[in-house]
């Protein structure tokens, strides 16, 4: 199931919708290029050195997930733009939604795991559990990635079952839009089943992300206060350096939470494909996802070096 499911009879396309569609495609293309660059840069390093840090393994996995997601989004939205009144559970959209559900859940889980990794590796907490995790965490990355794939697969399968039930019911009714039983089943699944699955499966990693990011920020603020008092002569230089270091982290938090909220609101709205609101939600969601790869490109040391070499 995607964010818009109601079919209307109108075949006309509003100019505003066309504009939003073009903006959406351009945003997705920028995200594809940004994530593709991350994949190539880190992938080349992995091939040349035969090794990659745990942090960069998470980054390349997140970039790959986002790269594929943006490609699916482009394909799906081109299809629904050209076929705005098609049945939203037909086999083509079912396949696109299956990939969208999997990749969206995978992206959320990978962001959550990246936040957990940042907290454990960067936080200055001295609790024995954190000290123990610092040494154990790099070896857990493959299992973390596998768990993200598993949870994402579960989400997509559960949503696909609901999509398939609606399509089968629609096919049995002879594709009649006024079939009361079919419409009742569809509205019930859209209102309760799909939304509940996505809220649960998206909220769990978001809560994990929020907890560990809060711990990290508290730890960093405490550390900054102590250092600020100790280095009275270099306060301006020190403050500027720490602000630059904190900016990517803060942007990651803001963009992740913004993307989560827009996904939830978009799923709750159940807007028809050809309506202005559907395309507006799509633009807002993917505006959040296009900014973070750019932040990563200019904040990650490995990627920054590649960019500088490319510009020279």
From Swiss-Prot:
Positions in coiled-coil regions: none
Residues spanning the membrane: 20-40, 67-87, 98-118, 141-161, 199-219, 245-265, 278-298
Pfam families per the UniProt record, alphabetical: TAS2R
Stretches in topological domain Extracellular: 1-19, 88-97, 162-198, 266-277
Keywords from the named record: G-protein coupled receptor, Glycoprotein, Membrane, Receptor, Sensory transduction, Taste, Transducer, Transmembrane, Transmembrane helix
Regions of this protein lying in the Cytoplasmic compartment: 41-66, 119-140, 220-244, 299-312
Subcellular locations according to the entry: Membrane
Glycosylation sites (chain numbering): 179
Membrane topology: Multi-pass membrane protein
GO MF assignments: bitter taste receptor activity; G protein-coupled receptor activity; taste receptor activity
Functional summary from the UniProt entry: Putative taste receptor which may play a role in the perception of bitterness.
Miscellaneous section: Several bitter taste receptors are expressed in a single taste receptor cell.
Protein name: Taste receptor type 2 member 135
């Amino acid at each position: 199931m995607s964010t818009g499911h109601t079919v209307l009879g109108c075949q006309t396309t509003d100019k505003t919708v066309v504009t939003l569609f073009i903006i959406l495609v351009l945003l997705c293309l920028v995200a594809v290029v940004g994530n593709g660059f991350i994949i190539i840069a880190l992938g080349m390093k992995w091939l040349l050195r035969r090794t990659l840090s745990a942090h960069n393994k998470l980054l390349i996995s997140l970039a790959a997930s986002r790269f594929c997601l943006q490609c699916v989004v482009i394909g799906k939205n081109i299809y629904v733009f050209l076929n705005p009144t098609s049945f939203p559970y037909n086999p083509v959209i079912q396949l696109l939604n299956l990939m969208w559900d999997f990749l969206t859940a995978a992206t959320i889980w990978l962001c959550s795991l990246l936040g957990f990794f940042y907290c454990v590796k960067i936080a200055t907490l001295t609790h024995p559990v954190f000290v123990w995790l610092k040494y154990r965490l790099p070896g857990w990355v493959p299992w973390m990635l596998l768990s993200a794939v598993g949870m994402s697969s579960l989400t997509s399968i559960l949503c696909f079952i609901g999509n398939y039930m609606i399509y089968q019911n629609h096919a049995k009714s002879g594709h009649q839009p006024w079939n009361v039983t079919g419409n009742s089943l569809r509205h019930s699944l859209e209102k309760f089943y799909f939304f509940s699955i996505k809220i649960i499966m998206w909220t769990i990693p978001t809560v994990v992300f929020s907890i560990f990011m809060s711990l990290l920020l508290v730890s960093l603020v405490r550390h900054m206060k102590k250092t600020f008092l100790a280095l009275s002569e270099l306060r301006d230089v020190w403050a500027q350096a720490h602000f630059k270091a904190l900016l990517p982290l803060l942007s990651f938090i803001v963009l992740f939470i913004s993307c989560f909220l827009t996904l939830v609101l978009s799923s709750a709205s159940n807007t028809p494909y050809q309506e202005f609101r559907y395309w507006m939600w799509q633009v807002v969601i993917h505006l959040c996802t296009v900014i973070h790869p750019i932040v990563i490109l200019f904040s990650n040391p490995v990627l920054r070096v590649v960019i500088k070499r490319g510009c020279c």
